[in-house]
């Protein structure tokens, strides 16, 4: 069962590794990111960052969708971490029933507009987010579970 879908350009780091799994009793993390899945060094580094007692997959969006829709992880409490809005939109197209997406960190870059404390969106990322919103998905900006969620839907 998917407990959290999160966009975070850093993929696995302190907030993702410690705060969210504890708050949501996560026992399986899927990093669905083509770059990480295709780079052995990045995959190894991310594997070292995973919390004890939590299993980890570093796979593509397509592989994540297949794994999640196959029923193989129905008994698990899963957190899916994606690196960007494009992969998130592709993921949502393949995995039905996603109702909330956590925007945890999208890096500042040239031409990006700030929407939240750690959320900077380019025109394409805004378009991707609007497409997610149009699917009826609640887009919450929140870095850690202890913070209040700020709704991105209202700002798009």
Question: What is the predicted function of each stretch?
Answer:
Residues 94-156:
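Glycine-rich, aromatic-bearing surface loops/beta-hairpins
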Residues 5, 31, 57-60, 80, ...:
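General beta-strand structural signal in soluble alpha/beta enzymes
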Residues 1-55:
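Long, hydrophobic N-terminal alpha-helical segment
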Residues 37-39, 64-65, 108-111:
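Short gly/pro/ser/thr-enriched loop/turn and capping motifs at secondary-structure boundaries
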Residues 1-2, 24-27, 54, 74-77, ...:
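Short coil/turn connectors at secondary-structure junctions
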Residues 46, 88-92, 129-130:
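Short amphipathic alpha-helical segments and helix-helix/interface helices
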Residues 59-104:
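Ordered, amphipathic secondary-structure segments that act as subunit-interaction surfaces
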Residues 47-49, 75, 119:
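Short, hinge-like loop/turn segments at secondary-structure boundaries
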């Amino acid at each position: 069962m998917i407990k959290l879908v999160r966009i975070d350009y850093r993929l696995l780091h302190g907030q993702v590794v410690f705060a969210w799994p504890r708050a949501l009793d996560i026992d399986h993390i899927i990093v669905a990111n083509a770059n990480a899945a295709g780079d052995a060094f990045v995959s190894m580094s991310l594997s070292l960052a995973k919390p004890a007692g939590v299993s980890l997959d570093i796979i593509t969006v397509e592989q994540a969708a297949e794994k999640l829709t196959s029923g193989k992880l129905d008994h698990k409490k899963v957190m899916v971490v994606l690196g960007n809005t494009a992969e998130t939109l592709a993921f949502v197209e393949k995995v039905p029933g996603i109702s909330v997406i956590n925007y945890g960190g999208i890096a500042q870059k040239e031409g990006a507009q700030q929407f939240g404390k750690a959320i900077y969106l380019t025109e394409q990322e805004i378009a991707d987010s609007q497409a997610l919103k149009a699917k009826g998905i609640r887009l919450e900006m929140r870095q850690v579970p202890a913070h209040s969620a700020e709704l991105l839907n209202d700002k798009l």
